[in-house]
Amino acid sequence: MEFIVFLDRIEIEIIRIVEEAGYSIKENSSLCLLSEKYAGFLIKKDKKIVICTDNAKKREGYTNRSNQNIDIFERTAIHIKKALRHEAVHVAQECNNGNLLEINKKLSINKAKFDALRGSKDISGEEEKERQAYILEDKPKLLKEKLEKYCL
């Protein structure tokens, strides 16, 4: 899986918990071809996260690691890490019997994510779960805690 090179230690720990919970992680499935704007999916019935590495690379202008400036690599990494974390929030929600996670009500979604929230809601039909995923994708330590609480 190519996307691993873009991750930090906390995302590797998140993957371990997700896999312990019985989920698999795949890369660049046919779902990614729906649109280059999609960076990840959770296929609930198959217990599978899909990371659209190629879409993230195209979106950020990444071609290859040896011929790249650090800024493009970092932007691509952020895109992939957030996609993994976002889908991992949905895993935690599934581990919580499909319910929202208990988080501080004062946490709010970054306004820059409103368009993405609309797109995700259109696919999943679950606005509050998507809102929570967009909030927690920026909080990897809190996400890890929630995965441990609900999935292990």
Functional labels for PLM-detected ranges:
Residues 8, 74-83, 123-128:
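Soluble non-cytosolic domains of exported or imported proteins
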Residues 48-53:
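Short, aliphatic-rich beta-strand segments
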Residues 102-152:
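Metalloprotease/metallohydrolase-associated module, dominated by Zn2+-dependent proteases
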Residues 56-84:
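Short pre-active-site segment immediately N-terminal to the catalytic Zn-binding motif
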Residues 6-27:
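Zn2+-dependent metallopeptidase catalytic core
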Residues 30-38, 104-111:
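Acidic helix-start/capping segments at beta-turn-to-alpha-helix junctions
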Residues 41-45:
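Extracellular/periplasmic catalytic domains that process cell-envelope and extracellular macromolecules
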Residues 87-104:
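Catalytic Zn2+-binding segment of zinc metalloproteases
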